[in-house]
């Protein structure tokens, strides 16, 4: 069976998954290996990778913007002014009240979720200066965007509609968005996310799925052999050909890039700068406070610093309550 990387560590730590041996033929790398490892134990075999990318409308842009400075210039074009609100522009849109989508801003400026590569829940970096700088930059965009972008439930649909109707030139989203854009017959391109104003990469979360073995499997040795088979280069190539999901196997990944598919190439390139999503159980305490932090800051309800401090305080308290601060 398959499980998302961010669930593998917690499920393994809770005793729901058996340990897995990574076969040398799996051709994994350090990033994907870290996504299936918790406390030095491996609970899954990397299957596919994913991360956020930039989609742009080829009917509106000749090439993908390479820097956020270029996106800022694009947002000055009156062609993208939002008709229903004076002074607002939709040239570029992103769902940055969603922590998954906004994390690249924070991490690219030096913020982080947990220390020691996502394994130390006692060290939370969502209110350090880098994280605050990232939130402050998001606020400059929300000053340009229509009020609807602050609707935490409706923002994603608003962004997709604007992009599909040709009112937005570029958006940040994941590989899963491609199917709906194809169905809507949008003439889109895919590229890596532009570099941040500080010149650093937009370090979004790196994720995907792994093959896992349930604890207590009736035939664990046979299950391990099947996992070994599924992660071989040939099988990973076959999986890509069937699903278009980017293989975790590095040799199969090169094969996929060689297919000259823009989405595949962008995901692989962007994944080089991705930060592995923490897979420890304590990660479950982060999502809601982080989303509140972003909304409170970009809506002006709180300063970026106060919003970040309050979020970290709540995360620490919840970890203490649920996990005893261990």
Which ranges hold each PLM region?
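Extracytoplasmic/periplasmic substrate-recognition and gating elements
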Residues: 40-42, 143, 182-244
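Extracytoplasmic/periplasmic solute-binding protein
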Residues: 43-47, 52, 72-124, 168
């Amino acid at each position: 069976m398959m499980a998302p990387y961010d669930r593998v560590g917690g499920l393994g730590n809770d005793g729901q998954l058996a340990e897995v041996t990574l076969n040398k033929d799996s051709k994994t790398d350090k990033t994907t290996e870290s996504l299936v490892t918790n406390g030095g134990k491996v609970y899954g075999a990397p299957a596919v990778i994913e991360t956020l990318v930039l989609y742009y409308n080829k009917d509106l842009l000749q090439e993908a913007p390479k820097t956020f400075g270029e996106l800022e210039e694009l947002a000055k074009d009156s062609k993208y002014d939002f008709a229903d609100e004076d002074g607002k522009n939709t040239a570029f849109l992103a769902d940055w009240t969603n922590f998954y989508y906004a994390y690249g801003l924070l991490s690219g400026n030096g913020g982080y979720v947990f220390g020691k590569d996502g394994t130390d829940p006692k060290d939370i970096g969502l209110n350090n200066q880098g994280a605050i700088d990232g939130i402050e930059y998001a606020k400059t965009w929300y000053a340009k965007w229509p009020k609807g972008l602050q609707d935490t439930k409706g923002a994603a649909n608003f962004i997709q509609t604007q992009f599909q109707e040709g009112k937005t030139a570029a958006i940040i989203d994941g590989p899963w968005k491609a199917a709906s854009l194809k169905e809507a017959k949008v003439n889109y391109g895919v590229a890596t996310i532009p570099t941040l104003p500080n010149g650093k990469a937009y370090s979004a979360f790196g994720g995907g799925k792994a093959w896992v073995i349930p604890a207590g499997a009736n035939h664990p040795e046979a299950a391990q052999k099947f996992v070994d088979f599924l992660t071989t280069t040939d099988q990973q190539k076959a999986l890509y050909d069937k699903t278009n999901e980017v293989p975790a196997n590095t040799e199969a990944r090169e094969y996929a890039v060689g297919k000259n598919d823009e989405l595949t190439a962008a995901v692989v390139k962007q994944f080089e700068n991705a930060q592995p999503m923490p897979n420890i159980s304590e990660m479950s305490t982060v999502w809601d406070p982080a989303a509140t932090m972003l909304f409170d800051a970009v809506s002006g309800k709180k300063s970026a610093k106060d919003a970040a401090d309050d979020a970290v305080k709540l995360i620490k308290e919840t970890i203490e309550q649920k996990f005893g601060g261990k």
